[in-house]
Amino acid sequence: EVQLQQSGPELVKPGASVKMSCKASGYTFTDYYMKWVKQSHGKSLEWIGDINPNNGGTSYNQKFKGKATLTVDKSSSTAYMQLNSLTSEDSAVYYCARDRYWYFDVWGAGTTVTVSS
């Protein structure tokens, strides 16, 4: 069974950073790009960026450049996203999704990030 297992919820203070994970199983990790998506309450999904697990190449939505950093660990079939300098605007659910030619065919359950002092 193809699965993406995301790390648990995070409660962080303004100005801090957070790093979440997305562990892939059931397929060859390096065969598919991994996308990251933000779902803010009451808003539509926003594409953050994607990473090629084969070579670590990344592409970012301009809005999230400097905010998000995407990395992978091929040895554990895990993708990571670090978010920096957090503010209340970063409170959201963040999803990883396997990219099949811009059709996101497998999704993680999401990681909830709450930024609060």
Curated annotation (Swiss-Prot):
Listed GO MF terms? antigen binding
Q: Which Gene3D superfamilies match?
A: Immunoglobulins
- Domain of life, source organism: Eukaryota
Keywords, in A-Z order: Adaptive immunity, Disulfide bond, Immunity, Immunoglobulin
- Choose one Gene Ontology CC annotation of this protein and give it: immunoglobulin complex
Q: Extra info from the record?
A: The sequences of 10 hybridoma proteins that also bind dextran differ from that shown at 1-7 positions, many of which occur in the D and J segments. This protein binds dextran.
Biological process terms from the Gene Ontology for this record are:
immunoglobulin mediated immune response
Q: Which Pfam families match?
A: V-set
Recorded protein name is: Ig heavy chain V region J558
Q: Which residues form the Ig-like domain?
A: 1-116
Q: Does Aminoacyl-tRNA synthetase appear among the keywords?
A: no
Question: Disulphide bridges in this chain?
Answer: C22-C96
